[in-house]
């Protein structure tokens, strides 16, 4: 299960490690920490992932983004709350990839696209992890 962490929304994707195929799953649309983790707990209960993957925002030059510290904190909280292995993965360009995929699927840009964008970005993060696992938390 992968997460595209944001201050307002968290995109979620799931996938099969054997097949290496990720799928968009959900968008958690709240900034309230307890509500976020309750939603994540429900998804973990339902999908029973063996590992969690969190996108780590990076600038194009490889330097950490302003949100990197928040993503690391989120990853540590996931590990502490759910006791599953958590991986951090460079998420450079995942939003660009997600926008392109949605455009190809005919999803128009705008407010309605944002939840789907977060899910597809999480899908891209998970696809990247399948190709090259990141750093364990």
UniProtKB/Swiss-Prot annotation:
This is Putative pre-16S rRNA nuclease. SMART domains: YqgFc. GO terms for cellular component: cytosol. Belongs to the YqgF nuclease family. It is an enzyme of class 3 (hydrolase). InterPro entries: RNaseH-like_sf, YqgF, YqgF/RNaseH-like_dom, YqgF/RNaseH-like_dom_sf. It holds the Pfam family RuvX. It comes from Chromobacterium violaceum (strain ATCC 12472 / DSM 30191 / JCM 1249 / CCUG 213 / NBRC 12614 / NCIMB 9131 / NCTC 9757 / MK). Its EC number is 3.1.-.-. Could be a nuclease involved in processing of the 5'-end of pre-16S rRNA.
């Amino acid at each position: 299960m992968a997460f595209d962490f944001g201050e307002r929304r968290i995109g979620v994707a799931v996938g099969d490690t054997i097949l290496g195929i990720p799928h968009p799953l959900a968008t958690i649309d709240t900034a309230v920490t307890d509500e976020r983790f309750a939603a994540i707990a429900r998804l973990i209960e339902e999908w029973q992932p063996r590992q969690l993957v969190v996108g780590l925002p990076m600038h194009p030059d490889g330097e950490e983004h302003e949100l990197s510290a928040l993503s690391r904190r989120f990853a540590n909280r996931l590990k502490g709350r759910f006791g599953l292995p958590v991986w951090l993965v460079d998420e450079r360009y995942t939003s660009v990839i997600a926008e392109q995929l949605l455009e190809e699927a005919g999803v128009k840009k705008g407010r309605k696209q944002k939840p789907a964008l977060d899910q597809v970005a999480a899908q891209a993060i998970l696809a990247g992890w399948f190709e090259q696992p990141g750093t364990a938390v």
